């Protein structure tokens, strides 16, 4: 999984050299941010169920057809609602992985790389997940550096889906 730290180490190693002072400064900066990222990941994890439920409701409110259309890819019945919540939870979980890793690697490798194919195959609209992530961003209750860290990865996911 790529992070700024693993990329710096990989580059230095492939060139047979020690980390440069710039690379070391990046590493120290990441260590300072790590605590905020871990706090954000813990808070999002602790509040995951309520955030996912609220995000799903935000999707249903903005896109009412998702609960009115019958079919495997809609939320007209409990099974569909459970699948929607599961998918939103997956996005949130990947964001927490980014917070722990300190980079977008988890989003890039586990989500964004195959999202177009997944959405096409299952007839899913990225706009549903954009709305869900916007809800999570607006309602996670984080502040300060933890908020900034979480929002940076939520924004990254939102932009990738937009």
Curated annotation (Swiss-Prot):
Q: Record's Pfam families? A: Phycobilisome
Q: Name one GO cellular component term.
A: phycobilisome
Q: How is it modified after translation?
A: Contains one covalently linked phycocyanobilin chromophore.
Entries under InterPro entries matching the protein: Globin-like_sf, Phycobilisome_asu/bsu, Phycobilisome_asu/bsu_sf, Phycocyanin_a
According to its UniProt entry, the protein's GO biological process terms are: photosynthesis
How is this protein situated with respect to the membrane?
Answer: Peripheral membrane protein
Chain sites annotated for binding (2R,3E)-phycocyanobilin: 84
The main location class comes to membrane
Q: Where in the cell is it found?
A: Cellular thylakoid membrane
> What residue range is the signal peptide?
none
**Which Gene3D superfamilies does this chain map to?**
Phycocyanins
Q: Which UniProt keywords apply?
A: Antenna complex, Bile pigment, Chromophore, Electron transport, Membrane, Photosynthesis, Phycobilisome, Thylakoid, Transport
Q: Per its UniProt entry, which superkingdom is the organism in? A: Bacteria
Subunit composition? Heterodimer of an alpha and a beta chain, which further assembles into trimers. The trimers assemble into hexamers, although these were not seen in the crystallographic studies. Part of 2 PBS rod complexes, the conventional CpcG-PBS rod and a photosystem I-specific CpcL-PBS rod, both of which include ferredoxin--NADP reductase (petH).
The free-text function statement in the UniProt record for this protein reads: Light-harvesting photosynthetic bile pigment-protein from the phycobiliprotein complex (phycobilisome, PBS). Phycocyanin is the major phycobiliprotein in the PBS rod.
- Homology family: Belongs to the phycobiliprotein family.
Q: Entry's NCBIfam families?
A: phycocy_alpha (TIGR01338)
The protein, known as: C-phycocyanin alpha subunit
């Amino acid at each position: 999984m790529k992070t700024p730290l693993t990329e710096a180490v990989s580059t230095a190693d492939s060139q047979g050299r020690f980390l440069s002072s710039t690379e070391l400064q990046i590493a120290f900066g990441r260590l300072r941010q790590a605590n905020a990222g871990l706090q954000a990941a813990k808070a999002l994890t602790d509040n995951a169920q309520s955030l996912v439920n609220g995000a799903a409701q935000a999707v249903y409110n903005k896109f009412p057809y998702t609960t009115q259309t019958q079919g495997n890819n809609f939320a007209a019945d409990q099974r569909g609602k459970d699948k929607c919540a599961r998918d939103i939870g997956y996005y949130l979980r990947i964001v927490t992985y980014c917070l722990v890793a300190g980079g977008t690697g988890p989003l890039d490798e586990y989500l964004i790389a195959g999202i177009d194919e997944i959405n096409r195959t299952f007839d899913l609209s990225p706009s549903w997940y954009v709305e869900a992530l916007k809800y999570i961003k607006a309602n996670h209750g984080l502040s300060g550096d933890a908020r900034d860290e979480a929002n940076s990865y939520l924004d990254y996911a939102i932009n990738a889906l937009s």
